[in-house]
């Protein structure tokens, strides 16, 4: 996803 939350950053890189 997008760097909206802290955990969402992991999905953005993945």
Curated annotation (Swiss-Prot):
Major localization class: secreted
Subcellular localization(s) per the UniProt record: Secreted, Cell wall
Domain of life: Eukaryota
Keyword annotations: Cell wall, Secreted
One Gene Ontology term, aspect cellular component: extracellular region
Protein name: 29 kDa cell wall protein
């Amino acid at each position: 996803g997008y760097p909206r939350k802290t955990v969402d950053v992991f999905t953005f890189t993945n």
